[in-house]
């Protein structure tokens, strides 16, 4: 059963505002603590929600699950570390908070379009001399959902 979270006249209800504030805190925690051992259960406990409720509300607000958002943050950070070129793929995997090299490699390849080792070899040269803030922006991973919505990645 769907609930209407807007008050009459299109004004957002206080309950909806509180819900959005809790979701923002969860997202901010993921952004800050992405390298820590986080999972949806721990995030939900911190937001005083069940894991299922958090997942549903997070997806409704941000268009992806908390786990997907966490993995994307980890992959974005991994991309920056791989561009530097001074860490191995395994070191980068553990530095960004992934506990499985296989899962890291699979997710990295899904988001970036190439395995982390290949990315390290090609992108370190491609972004040489580029300010890190610019390199981060131009090499940001594009999810399939974003490609279909924005046309990014289509040449």
Task: For each feature predicted by the language model, list its residue ranges.
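Short, basic-rich loop-to-helix N-cap that marks the start of a DNA-contacting helix
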Residues: 68-70
């Amino acid at each position: 059963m769907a609930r209407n979270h807007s008050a009459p006249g299109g004004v957002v209800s206080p309950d909806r505002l509180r819900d959005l504030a809790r979701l923002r805190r969860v997202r901010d925690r993921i952004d800050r603590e992405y390298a820590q051992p986080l999972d949806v259960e721990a995030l939900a406990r911190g937001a005083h929600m069940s894991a299922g409720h958090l997942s549903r509300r997070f997806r409704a607000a941000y268009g992806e699950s908390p786990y997907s958002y966490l993995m994307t943050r980890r992959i974005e950070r991994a991309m920056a570390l791989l561009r530097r070129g001074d860490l191995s793929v395994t070191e980068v995997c553990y530095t960004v908070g992934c506990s499985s090299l296989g899962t890291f490699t699979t997710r990295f390849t899904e988001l970036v379009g190439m395995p982390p080792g290949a990315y390290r070899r090609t992108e370190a040269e491609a972004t040489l001399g580029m300010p890190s803030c610019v390199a981060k922006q131009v090499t940001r991973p594009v999810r399939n959902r974003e490609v279909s919505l924005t046309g990014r990645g289509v040449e």
